[in-house]
From Swiss-Prot:
CDD domains: uS7_Mitochondria_Mammalian. SUPFAM superfamilies: Ribosomal protein S7. Residues 1-37 form a transit peptide. It is found in: Mitochondrion. Component of the mitochondrial ribosome small subunit (28S) which comprises a 12S rRNA and about 30 distinct proteins. One of its GO terms (cellular component) is mitochondrial small ribosomal subunit. Pfam families: Ribosomal_S7 (PF00177). It comes from the Eukaryota. It comes from Bos taurus (Bovine). Its main location: mitochondrion. Disulfide bonds: none annotated. Keywords: Acetylation, Mitochondrion, Ribonucleoprotein, Ribosomal protein, Transit peptide. This is Small ribosomal subunit protein uS7m.
Amino acid sequence: MAAPTAKVSRGWSGLALGVRIAVLRLPGLTQVRWSRYGPEYQDPQIDKEYYRKPLAQLTEEETYERELRKTQVIKAAPATKTSSVFEDPVISKFTNMMMKGGNKILARSLMTQTLEAVKRKQFEKYHAASAEEQATVERNPYTIFHQALKNCEPVIGLVPILKGGHFYQVPVPLAERRRRFLAMKWMITECREKKPRRMLMPEKLSQELLEAFCNRGPVIKRKHDMHKMAEANRALAHYRWW
């Protein structure tokens, strides 16, 4: 009885192998792990200005692309994307980094309260200033947020490189995406770890943003410390290539 059982098992394995080979050869399937869409799917275009542009003002390439998209399959737009005029990708990224436990509603609420606190503080400063000084007071919280992050971005970072059994901290220039990530990470870490027990997150974050906007505060100091370490290790810069 053992021989027929082995023959049946071998038959099933051969059938499964044949089905697998047939599936792999199908052109409509994609061998990308965790991918919902195949390579033939195009990214969605959610910008309203893209559709508001008259056809007479389109170039030949834009006209060809628009006609081509009529016959192509388009991916579903992410739930986090919107065509609102208030959409800011940098603030959305900061909100996602500030989120804990997947509670994005709370993270959005904290971000909204932070921007409101920044605006209230700046308006108090504006009304308390003289007529000459009022022109120099920035009251737009979005402008303050972007400038504060820009001031916190390091230009040069340190990367550990193994040479001769030892790790050396080698200074390397940072990409724009990495600089923005470090600025956001330092800002959030400073507000979480150095925040007084009875101080709310929006109050602490608004203080740090205003200090960074004026090139002051612990986050700016951390950026300068990284630059000093990179300057001290500049003799190891050639380890990037050797």
